[in-house]
Swiss-Prot record:
Part of the SNAPc complex composed of 5 subunits: SNAPC1, SNAPC2, SNAPC3, SNAPC4 and SNAPC5. SNAPC2 interacts with TBP and SNAPC4. It comes from the Eukaryota. This is snRNA-activating protein complex subunit 2. The gene is SNAPC2. It holds the Pfam family SNAPC2. PANTHER family: SNRNA-ACTIVATING PROTEIN COMPLEX SUBUNIT 2. Part of the SNAPc complex required for the transcription of both RNA polymerase II and III small-nuclear RNA genes. Binds to the proximal sequence element (PSE), a non-TATA-box basal promoter element common to these 2 types of genes. Recruits TBP and BRF2 to the U6 snRNA TATA box. Residues 137-200, 271-306 are annotated as: Disordered. One of its GO terms (molecular function) is RNA polymerase II general transcription initiation factor activity. Residues 167-180 have a biased composition (Low complexity). Keywords: Nucleus, Transcription, Transcription regulation. The lineage of its organism: Eukaryota, Metazoa, Chordata, Craniata, Vertebrata. It is found in: Nucleus. One of its GO terms (biological process) is transcription by RNA polymerase III. InterPro entries: SNAPC2.
């Protein structure tokens, strides 16, 4: 039987105003300074050790506060060397903001205080991607999975693909993985001079890579990547300039331009919206006391309404970019 219809509601983290972490008291700051002074010989303070001695503060809060201290020290050092800024006070005021700064400021105004909720949602997306069967099959060596389908084979170390294992594609996953076990055998004599540790360095676990990106997006403790996994992450970053021109840039530019003009256009003032509180305050004596509770309920409802709810957009996609504009543009067939 068909289940009864269920009304989908927004997550609880999107409903209310997300409050930031509690401010640091003077006692906590003095205690943190003493802990940092005791670790002057260390190149980088460990937030885990500091959280054990500094009660009431988590690793994430300590890590964020340390980043704020580093940024403050860097700004003070720049101000001492360049009192008027890197290009002087007048030049700095006249310099227009960079495009990324304009979009970042606009996104912050739209999402409001939901930055932490957006970081959590983005981290959850990467966590789900880490458990995808295709992700497990792309790892080297491939991880066992119950997903049915033809696993995608990785290229050999010499850059040549092995066409032989592709023939028994209709066979189940277990027999197809069995012939791959003797493949690393001929590589051992060539790697014996480098030592057994190189085998672990060349292992690529995409599940660990996704977990690493998920933890980094939330400034959390990330797993340690191998040399090959670090090379994969570096290659992803270096390939961004090559991948951006492959997007449908013309349609993407048109959409972003229309979105910017729509979001920055002056909004018309509603007829009764702005005069509602003032009219209620002026005519409080003429109105009956029975009409005041609905007005207070509306005021409370408007106060609980987030900026993204008032704008009618999803905070995970504040600029309403269609998904087809985020993929590679279709190349014309030759």
């Amino acid at each position: 039987m068909k289940p009864p219809p269920r009304r989908r509601a927004a997550p609880a983290r999107y409903l209310g105003e997300v409050t930031g972490p509690a401010t640091w008291s003077a006692r906590e700051k003095r205690q943190l300074v003493r802990l940092l002074q005791a670790r002057q010989g260390q190149p980088e303070p460990d937030a885990t050790e500091l959280a054990r001695e500094l009660r009431g503060r988590s690793e994430a809060e300590i890590r964020v506060f340390l980043q704020q201290l580093k940024g403050r020290v860097a700004r003070e050092a720049i101000q001492k060397v360049h009192p008027g800024g890197l290009q002087g006070p007048r030049r700095r005021e006249a310099q227009p903001p960079a495009p990324i700064e304009v979009w970042t400021d606009l996104a912050e105004k739209i999402t409001g205080p939901l930055e932490e909720a957006l970081a959590v949602a983005f981290s959850q997306v990467l966590t789900i991607a880490a458990t995808e069967p295709v992700t497990l099959l792309h790892s080297k060596p491939p991880k066992p999975t119950q997903a049915r389908g033809k696993p995608l084979l990785l290229s050999a170390p010499g850059g040549q693909e092995d066409p032989a294992p592709e023939i028994p594609s209709s066979a189940p996953a277990a027999p197809s993985s069995a012939p791959r076990t003797p493949d690393p055998a001929p590589e051992k004599p060539s790697e014996s001079s480098a030592g057994p540790s190189t085998e672990e360095d060349f292992a690529v676990d995409f599940e660990k890579i996704y977990k690493y990106l998920s933890s980094v997006s939330r400034s959390g403790r990330s797993p340690e990547l191998s040399a090959a996994e670090s090379a994969v992450v570096l290659d992803l970053l270096m390939s961004l300039p090559e991948e951006l021109p492959l997007l449908p840039c013309t349609a993407l530019v048109e959409h972003m331009t229309e979105t910017y003009l729509r979001l920055t256009a002056p909004q018309p003032i509603p007829a009764g919206g702005s005069l509602g509180p003032a009219a209620e305050g002026d005519g409080a004596g003429s109105k009956a006391p029975e009409e005041t509770p609905p007005a207070t309920e509306k005021a409370e409802h408007s106060e609980l309404k987030s900026p993204w709810q008032a704008a009618g957009i999803c905070p995970l996609n504040p600029f309403l970019v269609p998904l087809e504009l985020l993929g590679r543009a279709a190349t014309p067939a030759r």
